[in-house]
């Protein structure tokens, strides 16, 4: 069995925490896997809100700056402005997810140690594993695009593609927690994730699909915020661009924080189920 605690950031039984973890270290039922991420988020709401707000504001500012430059260079061309918005938003969205996923996982894993990390400390801990996390995000994106493109060749096969994607996502669901918690490189982390998830592929796949439904429901009120503000800002081009980009990135920010927290919780759950990490051995000094 692997040691329950690593030198910098891993988690497990045998730790004498300064405070009890927000989520109990034991195997969890499906309902708990859905509910506990929100409990963990609530326990660190200030740090996560600060992290999300800073990343969101920076991403929106970059999109608007790039769009403004392109619009100026193309003399306000509608096509040029539209492409600038789409491409800049896509790049910032991808980068936002990378940063939030790493920092949120680091913060969640620290909670299991009884440590409360602030936004800055979580970013620094994630930055130590920037290479593997970046590679994991690249493969995450390519896998999703590949599966959905193949599945969408025929409209009737699209639901099957979503199920296939859920299975693929489940096998790699705890890759980022392994990278941060066990200081693993990308290849070793993927193999470790598949080992931990083995036997619970469809449970975690179902969790992933259920979260897509939850995120869709959450998107309605979140998108309502910029549309409400449009009553005051008007419908000028830049006001509309700002509100639409802000609304989209806000939805992604909230969704990514929830999903990243779920990844950390599933990592602990699977280590308990597969390795008995929640079992204390008398006289064990780990």
For every predicted segment, state its role.
Residues 1-286:
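Hydrophobic alpha-helical membrane segments
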């Amino acid at each position: 069995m692997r040691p329950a605690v690593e030198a910098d950031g891993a988690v497990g039984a045998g730790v004498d925490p300064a405070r009890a973890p927000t989520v109990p270290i034991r195997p969890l039922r499906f309902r708990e896997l859905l509910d506990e991420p929100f409990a963990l988020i609530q326990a660190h709401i200030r740090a996560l809100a600060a992290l999300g707000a800073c990343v969101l504001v920076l991403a929106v500012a970059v999109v608007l700056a790039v769009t403004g430059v392109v619009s100026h260079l193309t003399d306000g061309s509608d096509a040029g402005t539209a492409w600038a918005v789409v491409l800049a938003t896509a790049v910032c969205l991808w980068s936002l997810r990378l940063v939030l996923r790493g920092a949120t996982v680091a913060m969640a894993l620290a909670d299991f140690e009884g440590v409360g990390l602030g936004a800055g400390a979580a970013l620094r801990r994630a930055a130590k594993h920037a290479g593997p996390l970046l590679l994991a995000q690249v493969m995450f994106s390519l896998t999703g695009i590949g599966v959905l493109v193949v599945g969408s060749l025929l409209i009737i096969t699209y639901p099957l593609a979503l199920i296939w994607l859920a299975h693929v996502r489940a096998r790699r669901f705890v890759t980022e927690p392994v990278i941060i918690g066990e200081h693993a490189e990308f290849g070793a982390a993927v193999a470790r994730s598949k080992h931990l998830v083995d036997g619970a592929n469809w449970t975690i796949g179902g969790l992933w699909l259920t979260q897509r439904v939850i995120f869709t429901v959450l998107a309605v009120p979140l998108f309502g915020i910029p549309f409400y503000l449009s009553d005051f800002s008007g419908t000028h081009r830049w006001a509309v661009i700002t509100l639409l980009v802000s609304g989209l990135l806000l939805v992604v920010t909230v969704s990514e924080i929830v999903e990243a927290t779920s990844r950390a919780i599933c990592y602990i759950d699977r280590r308990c189920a597969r390795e008995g990490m929640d079992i204390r051995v008398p006289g064990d000094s780990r």
